[in-house]
Amino acid sequence: MRVRLLILMLFLSLAAIAQNESNGLLYGKVVDEQNMPVDLANVAVSELSIGVTTDSRGRYELSLPVDTTLTLNFTFVGFQSEQRKVRLSKGEKRKLDVVLKSNATTLPDAVISDRAIDASSLTRLNAKQATLLPSIGGGIENLVKTLPGVISNNELSSQYTVRGGNFDENLIYVNGVEIYRPFLVGSGQQEGLSFVNSRLVNNIEFSAGGFAAEYGDKMSSVLDVTYKKPRETAASLTLSLLGAEVHAEGVLGKDKFSYLVGGRYKNTAIALNVMDTKGSYRPNFTDVQALFHYKINDRLDCSLLGYYSKNQYYLAPESSSADAGFVNSVFRLDVFFEGQEVDDYATGLGALTFDYKPNEHLDLKFITSAYSAYETETYDIFGEYYLGQVETSLGSEQQGNVISNMGTGAYLKHARNAFYVQVYNFDHKGMRVQDRNVLKWGLRYQRQNVDDVVNEWNMIDSAGYSLPHSMDQVGVMPALLPDLSLDMFHRAHNVLGINNVDGFVQQSLTFPLHDESEIVVTAGLRANYWGYNKKMYASPRVGVAYKPNLEGQDLVFRLSGGVYHQTPFYREIRNRDGSLFKDAKAQRSYQVILGGDYKFRAWDRPFILTSEAYYKYLAHVIPYDVDNVRIRYYADQRAKGYAMGLDFKINGEFVKGIDSWASLSFMRNREDVEGDYYLVDSEGKKLPFYHHSDAAVADTIPLGWHYRPSNQLVSFSLFFQDYIPNAPTWKVNMTLTFGTGMPVNDNESDFYVPFKTYPPYRRVDIGFVKQLINEGSSFSKGNPLNYVKNMFLSVEVFNLLNISNTVSYTWVKDIYNTSWGINSYLTPRYVNVKLVTEF
């Protein structure tokens, strides 16, 4: 494995070094109408699907192929896009400066406040990079997963954890509307399509912590996505073995009305059919969303966002076989199934936004949104398993075969779960800009309606085959002996309505210093009233950014922190048996983040080194455990904890003219649950908390601190792009991910007793892209290909190194009552073909 990885990295390094320097060089500066530099503006080449971002002084550089007419697009949020055509000669260096004009519907001064945010903890991502990214779960989320502090050990899911949190601690906004994650989904293969459609995206901002008061009440991260406002007619069509995507956009009525529509279909059967569990898979995931924008007058705009998705997952398992153990002690679990699982998830969202600008300094938004989801989970799965020891001796005739029986048994899993939720939001947000100082405020009323039906149980049938089983007892009928037991039984029906109110006020002040250095201070207060327990929570937050004026050095230092309350949505207040915990409270953390950006040049190319150190004191959290992507909370338990770590990211032109980046993170994440303990007998022997033996319990000993389920000591990710010199229509996109193992519990241990550690997660996905048509292509008159702007053919190899990554464990007992965790693996290597057409 190490040799393969070293060879791969050596190949990529040589490819980057071997770039042909005979290309032409285009450089210049991007400024606004006041001749102020626009930093982090996107400079993209349409024909090559490559691009760079400007530095803090608005400068950019691009190495371009010669003797080819290329189209450059200059874009930045809040500005009108600019387009230029260039044609360079061999060895030519040409300067091209561009002035971006403010949107008519955007306050000119508001752009300054947006750049001040860049000096804080928000990271911008280029949505175009997600279009050709090799991914199964989702384009935008896969880009987020490559950032420092972000952890995802499941390529089938779009979910991720950030700096020791869990899936429920991440905020996602689309055009200012909060998006919610599915409730009943238990595994990545059931999840389907994420909300964000990368084809519709204009701007992406992400923060891994320390975000300002304007963002909501979650403890880990915020992903803020803004959809495009079209200015011309365009469309795209994507076809692949995993599904299809289509989108259309345009303007009508002298630019007063614009539309943006996208639809997606996803079928992951080719990925699921190569997994360990064999059977009939029928996953069908579909969604459609649209954004309509109407300019009522010069001061008032109106937009409507609509979304509907239908995700269906059907599985009729037949058999499964998996090995576990060590080199000289290997065990095999064979399972034969009957039954089926049928899951259905329907989600809808509508949001109406009015944006009123009474003058050049004031911006008022009013957003009304309604979210609805109906999810059902039904299954009856009967499994008969056989656990055996595998012969590992070299040269043995039985090598690789099962040579002894260690246990047999059967189980039956049953569920009839249904979850229905409605969320209504009435939201006002305001912003006043005066010079370079920005005042923001907001107020929201929210109504949550939940109807939750829980009916699930597991039955284990030892039937005298798997031990221990009840011994014969004099005077007791065999039918009364507990050979048949419900290992788990949950039944409940909860109907709940909650009224919530939250708001914030936030001030950003910019202080220019005498030496042309700059300090930006952002301070705010967020308040939240949670109707479930009728309590108010206050969350003060502050951030400071300092940009010194150093000759030849481009540095920004940041310090941010504050209080972060997270009121439970619903999942956190539901006990494992389905009942609701009445005395629930909001989770609370105190965070401090110290970081900085250093922009420099190496090999005559621009780079940015970002580093952050953070400490999060978890003053009040709810313990939980994770199985695949399903989180089960211990709602009636309380814990304190901490997360601390270091994050690093190097972003720049590893290959001249194309952005790539690498992220490295170190983290320690622990907690101490109130009242947790373990048992010891009279001989001092430790007993499990689920103690059922006849040995007398002599004492209880506090357990103390332990690792949280999301603890991952080291994680590394790489997003790499390359192209062939003098043939830039051939391109490579690659993502590499490594993460050390995280804690896992067996099926009987309590949450605070980590049973073992998952193996490290290691994965490489690579896509080979050929651009078949670009805007410079010409065809005969009447040829329908004249309507095609760009066409790409991509061959994607998922899990290039064919590494078996563990997503969960199947726990069984042998004849000696020892629990064995048999690995459940994620997808092996397989190939996908994708055709992308842009009109």
Positions of the model-derived regions?
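Gram-negative outer-membrane beta-barrel transporters
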Residues: F511-D515, Y615-Y617, Q637-P743, V836-E838
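Short, acidic, small-residue-rich periplasmic hinge/interaction motif at the N-terminus
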Residues: K29-M36, A41-S46, N73-F79, S89-G137, ...
